[in-house]
Amino acid sequence: MAISRAAHRLSVEGRPVFHMEFGQPSTGAPPRAIAAAHARLDSEAGGYWESPALRERIAALYRDRHGLAIDADRILLTCGASPALALAIAGLFCPGDRIAFVRPGYVAYRNAVAALGRVPVEIGADATTRYQIDARHIEALDEAPAGLIVASPANPTGSMIDAAGLAALAATAARRGVRIIADEIYHGLDYGAPAHSMLEFDPDAIVINSFSKYWSMPGWRLGWIVAPPGTADHLRAYVGSLYLTPPTLSQHAALVAMDETDVLEGYRETYRRNRAHLLDTLPQLGLGRIAPPDGAFYIWADVGDYTRDSMAFCQKLLAETGVAIAPGIDFDPVEGHHFVRFSFAVSEDRAQAAMVRFGDWLGRQARPYAKNTRRSTPS
């Protein structure tokens, strides 16, 4: 967040800024979804409402993508994935419960777990597991946690867990009495094999998702949670106390957006081209140690030849070039001092221009740690 605030200040001053620190699509909502919202503004007052049609359409998504029969009554609409995560933690875990997640990982996991009175348990991962959690991590814990947050594709790495890995995680979690929260917010944004839902392997998993990423609707604040069987009514009691319903306009727009496949796949192709450009450019600049970006829109790169202070590295880069990237310390307080995250959810011309500036700048930086060698990340 410090880099984002600094980038905003530069923008206010009139400096050109290349926002590669945000996990926010630059593509915008599908045009027909926006038109649907306009039409509703002209015809409705817009009261509290939860769309039955949208819940049914989300259930159909699981059928079509994953071959799963999900009762629409198990789907609760939320004001984005972050409230869905808070709802899962508050509604299905007790104060003092230990909830585990991988490091590097999305900073909100640690913050949400702690803020809600549960105990964060960080599990370090590295290139040997593609920066992902696997069943061996859970087996190795002396005390099994009450919960485990799994993200595939993941933020900040973009790495995914394949079907065998998810199945092993589900089996190990079940054996040790661990309830899984699956953050599937980046589903749809994959560049090889499609992502599997944890529900394919654990029918009792808590699954959260959002319209912010694949559907390119971050500001519309709409997501959902698939509640485990028998828990939906319990969670709805929390919803009624927290936010009643998500924004009505967003629900109308999202229902249209879900069928805008050609537009959405066009967005994904933009990210795919940006990804290819960064994967070609960064190794040429000497940054070849990166996590495998199977999905999402991130590159997690080791800049350890240049720095042991990723925040200072990113601050200097921003001040001297206008290129904003995220310091690894935001995602991994232990090893993140020599990593950075690039977001390629920007337009193609901005991605290319940013890489030119970054490359010119990097070429002028000293490499005081270049003699330290590390194993390259497996593909």
Language-model features and meaning:
Residues 1-80, 87, 257-258, 277, ...:
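N-terminal small-domain helix-loop-helix segment of the aminotransferase-like
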Residues 229, 246-260, 266-267:
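Structural motif of enzymes handling amino- and sulfur-group chemistry
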Residues 127-193:
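Active-site phosphate-binding strand-loop segment of PLP-dependent enzymes
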Residues 91-151, 171:
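PLP-dependent aminotransferase-like
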Residues 201-234, 246-249, 338:
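Active-site PLP attachment segment
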Residues 316-325, 331-379:
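PLP-dependent enzyme catalytic core of the Aspartate aminotransferase-like
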Residues 255, 271-282, 290-303:
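Conserved glycine-rich beta-strand-loop-beta hairpin in the small C-terminal domain of fold type I
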Residues 235-240, 257-280:
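Structural signature of PLP-dependent enzymes
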